[in-house]
């Protein structure tokens, strides 16, 4: 692995940079199980809250709108948290979604000196036979010389409810399909696009959204699924030309090969305003 690329993923991006709240992440150990525990200490998944006995008000459902780790820590500090290692009741945690667990996980890894990045794609372990919208994070394992996927959302309760048979600290490639891989699988006719999505949204539009989210996340700009910055994020695939499909096919190929040719990938994304997240969207709120 290119040492410059690992250094890139070791450094914070705008969504994980921590400024005024550094005391809340002081002395994070370079130990993935502990980092995941810290993530679970501070976040409660919006769509699992009932399983933990927490009923959400409309106001609490707005908490995932805070994108950046700094903003999340500020929110938690106001709720009485002093450090991410503190264990509190589920009701005292901040409400988030899978993206938040993954972005915070990547941020804490970087604080611990571990290269990491959030990934958007689809999980096969939520609904049998379907590829459901999801996020994980990857960290670089020096000993194994490879990226290892982690699902920081899957605590003991969720593992039991979902009958998870794999280690959430080492998610397999068949368990989580990244956005670019999913797109190319469907374009090659190796998977049914209508099996990819969540809730009432399925098909190529959702595949495109998660590819765009993953590509920008690999440039350390992990957006929320509902963020709409125009370009291909807003244009339904039913309205695409052959040229549009060719562009996104190429994006998928370059994103899948990000480690082999980061320069080609980053140049392609940053050179296409219909793909790249605009600067005004990028803020650690």
Segments predicted by a language model, with ranges:
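Secondary-structure boundary elements
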Residues: 2-92
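Active-site neighborhood of thiol-dependent amide/isopeptide-bond enzymes
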Residues: 61-135
């Amino acid at each position: 692995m290119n040492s410059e690329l690992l250094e890139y993923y070791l450094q914070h991006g705008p969504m994980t940079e921590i400024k005024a709240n550094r005391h809340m992440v002081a002395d994070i150990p370079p130990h993935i199980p502990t980092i995941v525990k810290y993530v679970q200490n501070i976040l409660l998944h919006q769509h699992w809250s009932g399983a933990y006995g927490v009923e959400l008000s409309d106001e609490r459902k707005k908490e995932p709108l805070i994108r950046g780790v700094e903003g999340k820590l500020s929110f938690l500090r106001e709720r009485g948290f002093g450090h991410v290692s503190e264990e509190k009741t589920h009701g005292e945690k901040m409400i988030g979604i899978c993206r938040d667990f993954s972005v915070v996980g990547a941020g804490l890894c970087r604080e611990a000196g571990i290269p990491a990045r959030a990934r958007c794609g689809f999980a096969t372990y939520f609904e049998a036979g379907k590829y459901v919208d999801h996020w994980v994070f990857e960290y670089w394992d020096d000993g194994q010389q490879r990226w290892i996927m982690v699902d920081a959302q899957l605590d003991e309760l969720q593992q039991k409810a979902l009958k998870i048979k794999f280690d959430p600290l080492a998610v397999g490639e068949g368990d989580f399909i990244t956005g670019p891989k999913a797109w190319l699988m469907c374009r090659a006719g190796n998977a049914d696009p209508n099996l990819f999505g969540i809730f009432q949204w399925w098909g190529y539009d959702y595949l495109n959204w998660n590819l765009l989210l993953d590509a920008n996340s690999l440039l350390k700009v992990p957006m929320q699924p509902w963020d709409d910055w125009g370009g291909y994020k807003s244009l339904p695939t039913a309205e695409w030309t052959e040229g549009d499909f060719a562009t996104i096919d190429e994006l998928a190929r370059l994103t899948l090969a990000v480690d082999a040719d980061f320069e080609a990938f980053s140049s392609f994304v940053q050179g296409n305003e219909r793909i790249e997240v605009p600067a005004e969207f990028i803020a650690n709120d």
